């Protein structure tokens, strides 16, 4: 407990009192390069605390359940989208969509390509083929 007490009662107040914080607005323009470097650590700590508080308490920073959806337009009236495709009906091979962006559900039409370019993602189709 003694190191924490020393930090709070002695080290931290000494550090804060030694910071080159000017008394007036014009004083900020008279700070040297070394003074600006000394102000970086406390500024970074305050920015980190502010950002953490923003993420914790601001509703706009939290993800909503609606934006977490992967299916935005395919058969939304159904509770669960399920397609049964008989393997015997596949001629040589078939590409099935995994990204929910296709207009030709359940088959892939390459809509994931634009999504991959925009987001840097690597999603692709599931390709099912017959053994030869």
UniProtKB/Swiss-Prot annotation:
Classification via InterPro entries: CISD1/2, FeS-contain_CDGSH-typ, FeS-contain_mitoNEET_N, MitoNEET_CISD
Cofactor-binding details, from the entry: Binds 1 [2Fe-2S] cluster.
One GO location term (cellular component): mitochondrial outer membrane
Membrane topology: Single-pass membrane protein
Cytoplasmic membrane side: 59-132
Gene Ontology biological process: regulation of autophagy
Secreted as UniProt keyword: no
Gene3D superfamilies named among the record's database cross-references: CDGSH iron-sulfur domain, mitoNEET-type (3.40.5.90)
Keywords annotated in UniProt: 2Fe-2S, Endoplasmic reticulum, Iron, Iron-sulfur, Membrane, Metal-binding, Transmembrane, Transmembrane helix
Subcellular localization, as worded in the UniProt entry: Endoplasmic reticulum membrane
Transmembrane portions of the chain: 36-58
Organism phylogeny: Eukaryota, Metazoa, Ecdysozoa, Arthropoda, Hexapoda
Similarity section: Belongs to the CISD protein family. CISD2 subfamily.
Gene Ontology MF terms: 2 iron, 2 sulfur cluster binding; metal ion binding
N-terminal signal peptide: none
Organism (species): Drosophila grimshawi (Hawaiian fruit fly)
Principal place of residence: endoplasmic reticulum
Protein name per Swiss-Prot or TrEMBL: CDGSH iron-sulfur domain-containing protein 2 homolog
Lumenal compartment segments: 1-35
Sequence positions that bind [2Fe-2S] cluster: 97, 99, 108, 112
Domain of life from the UniProt record: Eukaryota
Cofactor (UniProt): [2Fe-2S] cluster
């Amino acid at each position: 407990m003694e190191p924490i007490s020393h930090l709070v009662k002695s080290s931290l107040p000494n550090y804060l009192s030694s910071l080159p914080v000017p008394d007036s607005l014009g004083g900020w323009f008279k700070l040297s390069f070394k003074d600006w470097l000394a102000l970086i650590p406390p500024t970074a700590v305050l920015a980190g605390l502010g950002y953490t508080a923003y993420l914790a308490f601001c509703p706009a920073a939290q993800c909503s359940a609606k934006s977490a959806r992967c299916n935005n337009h395919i058969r939304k009236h159904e509770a669960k989208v399920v397609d049964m495709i008989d393997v015997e009906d596949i001629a040589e091979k078939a590409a099935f969509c995994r990204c929910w962006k296709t207009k030709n559900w359940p088959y892939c039409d390459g809509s994931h390509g634009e999504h991959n370019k925009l987001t840097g993602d690597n999603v692709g189709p599931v390709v099912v083929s017959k053994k030869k």
